[in-house]
Amino acid sequence: MLKKTTKNIVVFASGSGSNAIKIYEYFQKDNRVNIKALCCNKKSAPVIQKFQNIGIKTIVFEKNNLDNGGVLKTLLNLNPSLIILAGFLLKMPAEIINSFKNRIINIHPALLPSYGGKGMYGINIHRGVVENNELFSC
């Protein structure tokens, strides 16, 4: 019989947290998954209060902590099995991506850095790619 192991997840979000909350609600049905923390770069983002209200650790940081290794150090201490970027609006530094290779999912479908920002999802990304004669769009 296979032993069940709990997978710890860290969620990154920057705004209202609608996607982050849906992820939380989904994993409430699965005791093999634990959302260990929410990381947010905006101290006024509504997602912070939502996660505090349900008892999940919230970590608020400034952009310079993302760039200078402070967030990486926190993530290494949390040691998540998976990092989910759920409406997180900053570009992840290469150091974090390399430290958590194949353990980061970005559910916001932007093609960064070329096609990021407000409104850049769905057909808007594809239009941008086509208009700029680029070769890749998914």
Regions found by a protein language model. Name each.
Residues 1-138:
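One-carbon transfer enzymes
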